[in-house]
């Protein structure tokens, strides 16, 4: 069952006469009890997409759907939507008011939505977030907590509204390595126990491997590759995905991308990744006869299908036998690690 969906979503910003296409045609679904990782480097549009799914940005075209119903932008509709779809920010220190106790921080949402049994909600949310006994934390302030405990308070603040979807923007980026695993395990436990769905926004493919059911890789406002996590991260087809994976510690040879970082005000013709593409630069695209297409023919917008799909002229042109051999080799390599 699809809970949250982006359908041909486009978001634009205009500044000093320049139009930035931050999200430039995205189809994405998050199903019931599913964790989807949205991956990409800074500036690719993933945070703007997440904010739009929350109703914090209004799309230029396309639509956001929740439970199959398009999101309306009246105050009442947005209020109801944000109770069902809650945001978890990456910096717990910045998202918690230092003058508010843990109780006040978690109770803020139920008070805004005028929900009954405030004390019980706060205690239950803290307990589900792993802060037990919850009463022990009621009167503490953020500076009295560890980084992991502060992130659990932020998660508890979302859980206090009984949402069905969490949108977590870099949920462990500011945490020590020793605490990251605890927070990821908590998100998985909430999915298993409460049936929560989650969209996890991250630049870290290692995090996606540990937590996600599906991965969507975003570059310059579009999803360029998506599919089941095992398929995408063991046998990536898009050169951008390959470059992101190559910086993981287990990778034998990192790919250094040339060219300029993505600029949403200057989207190149053809494949939007071609100015930095290592496949095009190496001559491999010319060998398959698609180098001209890479620089001239735009690629179609990927659908919201859960099956593996890629927007790449070179990947589409490679013989099926070569693709199978590459996928089999990648799978063996991951198992060996």
Q: Which residue stretches match the model-derived regions?
A:
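Short catalytic/signature loops enriched in Gly
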Residues: 19, 226-329, 334-337
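ABC transporter nucleotide-binding domains
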Residues: 1-234, 316-337
């Amino acid at each position: 069952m699809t809970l949250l969906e982006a359908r041909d979503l486009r978001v634009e910003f205009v500044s000093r006469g320049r139009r930035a296409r931050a999200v430039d045609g995205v189809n994405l679904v998050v199903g019931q009890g599913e964790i989807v990782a949205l991956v990409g480097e800074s500036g690719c549009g993933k945070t703007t997409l997440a904010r739009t799914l929350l109703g914090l940005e209004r799309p230029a075209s396309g639509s956001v759907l929740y439970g199959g119903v398009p999101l309306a932008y009246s105050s009442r509709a947005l209020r109801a939507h944000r109770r069902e779809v809650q945001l978890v920010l990456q910096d717990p220190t910045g998202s918690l008011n230092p003058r508010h106790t843990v109780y006040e921080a978690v109770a803020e949402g139920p008070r805004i939505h005028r929900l009954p049994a405030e004390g019980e909600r706060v205690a239950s949310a803290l307990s589900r977030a792993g802060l037990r006994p919850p009463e022990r934390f009621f009167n503490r302030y953020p500076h009295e907590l560890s980084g992991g405990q502060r992130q659990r308070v932020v998660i508890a603040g979302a859980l206090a509204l009984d949402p069905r979807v969490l949108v977590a923007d870099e949920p462990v980026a500011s945490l020590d390595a020793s605490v990251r695993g605890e927070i990821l395990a908590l998100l998985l436990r909430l999915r298993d126990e409460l049936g929560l769905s989650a969209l996890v926004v991250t630049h870290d493919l290692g995090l996606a491997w540990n937590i996600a059911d599906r991965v969507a890789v975003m570059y310059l406002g579009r999803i360029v590759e998506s599919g089941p996590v095992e398929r995408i991260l063991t046998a990536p087809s898009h050169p951008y995905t390959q470059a992101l994976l190559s910086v993981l510690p287990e990778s034998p040879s990192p790919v250094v991308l040339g060219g300029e970082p993505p600029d949403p005000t200057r989207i190149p013709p053809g494949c939007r990744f071609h100015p930095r593409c290592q496949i095009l630069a190496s001559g491999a695209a010319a060998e398959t006869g698609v180098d001209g297409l890479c620089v001239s023919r735009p690629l179609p917008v990927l659908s919201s299908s859960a099956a593996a799909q890629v927007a790449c002229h070179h990947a589409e042109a490679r013989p099926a036998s070569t693709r199978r051999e590459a996928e089999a080799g990648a799978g063996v390599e991951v198992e060996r690690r």
